[in-house]
Amino acid sequence: MPKSLLLVLALALLAQTALANGPQGSSDRNWIRLG
């Protein structure tokens, strides 16, 4: 499995948990952008 695909899956999982967390999701998305 290509590392890029693994990275996309990890980001998708993070985004999903961020949405599930509600208001906290915005800060999580900012962290993803900075990271």
From Swiss-Prot:
Modified residues (Leucine amide): 34
Source organism superkingdom: Eukaryota
A GO cellular-component term linked to this record: extracellular region
UniProt keyword Transmembrane, yes or no: no
Primary site of residence: secreted
Subcellular compartments: Secreted
UniProt protein name: U-limacoditoxin(13)-Dv73
